Amino acid sequence: MVPKPLSLLLLLLLALSAAVVGGRKRVAAGGWRPIENLNSAEVQDVAQFAVSEHNKQANDELQYQSVVRGYTQVVAGTNYRLVIAAKDGAVVGNYEAVVWDKPWMHFRNLTSFRKV
């Protein structure tokens, strides 16, 4: 039999942990989370990198305009999935870019880039 003070402590800890977990938004491990501030310097930097890298790889001349929406996913670093408005000549279109970022290694890779 567990002593009464220890039982009360365990019950209190269980109730506290349930309250903490219940108050959080649940996102599956490795799931995509919406980016709250699309205008942050970090998001803008990743978006501009995506357009610049696409231009190098595809010999294109898109001009970055803005981030329309975006999501992050924690992996061995961070994946950014961004919908970017970019100008192709006089026409503005939306493009989806996925960028893998590991800032502590000064590593950034454009995983995909496509018109949406």
UniProtKB/Swiss-Prot annotation:
Glycans are attached at residue 109. Keywords: Allergen, Glycoprotein, Plant defense, Protease inhibitor, Secreted, Signal, Thiol protease inhibitor. Residues 1-22 form the signal peptide. InterPro entries: Cystatin_dom, Cystatin_sf. The record marks 30 as: Reactive site. A motif (Secondary area of contact) lies at residues 73-77. GO terms for cellular component: extracellular region. It is found in: Secreted. GO terms for biological process: defense response. It holds the Pfam family SQAPI. One of its GO terms (molecular function) is cysteine-type endopeptidase inhibitor activity. Residues 30-89 form the Cystatin domain. Belongs to the cystatin family. Phytocystatin subfamily. Specific inhibitor of papain family cysteine proteinases. This is Cysteine proteinase inhibitor 1. It comes from Actinidia chinensis var. chinensis (Chinese soft-hair kiwi). The gene is CYT1.
